Swiss-Prot record:
UniProt EC number: 3.1.3.16
All copies of domain Ubiquitin-like, residue ranges: 3-81
Molecular function GO terms recorded: metal ion binding; protein serine/threonine phosphatase activity
Transmembrane domains' residue ranges: none
Protein name in UniProt: Ubiquitin-like domain-containing CTD phosphatase 1
Pfam families: NIF (PF03031), ubiquitin (PF00240)
Database matches in InterPro entries: FCP1_dom, HAD-like_sf, HAD-SF_hydro_IIID, HAD_sf, Ubiquitin-like_dom, Ubiquitin-like_domsf, UBLCP1
Cell compartment(s), UniProt: Nucleus
Needed cofactors: Mg(2+)
Taxonomic source organism: Xenopus laevis (African clawed frog)
Length: 318
């Protein structure tokens, strides 16, 4: 009996009707190779289950009891595309290689269900704009806990737990960047904390808007399982006329938060034990200098922020 299937890959649909129930999963993959150029060993077919597990290559399609025109999502990259992605452009040692960050990033970043979740956030999440985006400015997205202040230590006031040089850092950044606060907590908590730290009332800079945990999405990764992330695509989808991957940088002390946008994320050292480290922490001073250096660039997505200190030392040594 002939099977009719629809394979979804790369934003396209590929109808298949030349396979029979006696053909195997591997036969299906070889048919897809001729259509897409993706090698069978590079493919993942989502939704093909046998006895509760992903169907192995030798499983016959007939035992999977596929309904006519069943839609199957395929993941995989053409060999030439992989070579292109993995080969760093010449004469630029600051260009990021996604595979250095994490091999699963490529899969997570482009997975269709994750992009669909972002689209829903773009459509449904309500942003309260505190100050309108400014033409020609880049975008700086900042985490709160352990990035701007130590939220675990005890103190009489929030000022005691504030990261050193916070207001100087934000004042300097505001010259070149619109500033967005994004915390994995509730908006009520974010507003209270920003007010307590004097961030939303400072005359030297303005916050464009703030995002809470409701703007985040959950993604599945092979290595980490389910994780919550902060997809910058939510901001780009809502304010695409101002912000994109080319002019956005995000600071967070948790690297997985920018799993969907690794090329835009900078993992900041966490600020903890404020009473012990208040006089020693100079992270925001150095990062202020880094932001000033890269503000001159047309495309921030080509930088590897993992090596920001090396980049800064190199620039300052010139």
């Amino acid at each position: 009996m002939t099977l009719s299937l629809i394979i979804k890959w790369g934003g396209q649909e590929f109808p298949l009707s030349a396979l029979s129930e006696e053909d195997t999963v591997l036969d299906l993959k070889h048919s897809l190779k001729s259509l897409t150029g993706v090698l069978p060993e590079r493919m993942k077919l989502l939704g093909l289950k046998y006895k509760g597990k992903p169907a192995e290559n030798d499983v016959k399609l007939g035992v999977l009891r596929l309904k006519p025109n069943t839609k199957i999502m395929m993941m995989g990259t053409r060999e030439e595309s992989l070579e292109e992605m993995m080969a760093p452009p010449p004469d630029n040692d600051e260009v990021v290689n996604d595979f250095d960050i994490d091999e699963e990033v490529v899969e997570v970043e482009n997975r269709e269900e994750n992009l669909a979740k972002i689209s829903r956030r773009v459509k449904d999440y309500k942003v309260e704009v505190l100050n309108p985006p400014r033409e020609g400015k880049k975008l700086l997205v900042l985490d709160v806990d352990y990035t701007l202040f130590d939220h675990r230590s005890c103190a009489e006031t929030g000022q005691e737990l504030m990261r050193p040089y916070l207001h100087e850092f934000l004042s300097s950044a505001y010259e070149d960047y619109d500033i967005v606060i994004w915390s994995a907590t509730s908006m009520k908590w974010i507003e209270a904390k920003m007010k307590e730290l004097g961030v939303t009332t400072n005359a030297n800079y303005k916050i464009t808007f703030m995002l809470d945990s409701a703007a985040m999405i959950t993604v599945h990764t092979p290595r980490r399982g389910l994780v919550d992330v902060k997809p910058l695509g939510v901001i780009w989808g809502k304010y695409g006329e101002f912000y994109s991957k080319n002019n956005t940088i995000m600071f967070d002390d948790i690297g997985r938060n920018f799993l969907m946008n690794p090329q835009n994320g900078l993992k900041i050292r966490p600020f903890m034990k404020a009473h012990l480290n208040r006089d020693k922490d100079k992270e925001l001073v150095k990062l202020s200098q880094y932001l000033k250096e890269i503000a001159q660039l047309d495309d921030l997505s080509e930088l590897n922020h993992k090596h920001w200190e090396r980049y800064l030392a190199k620039k300052q040594g010139q």
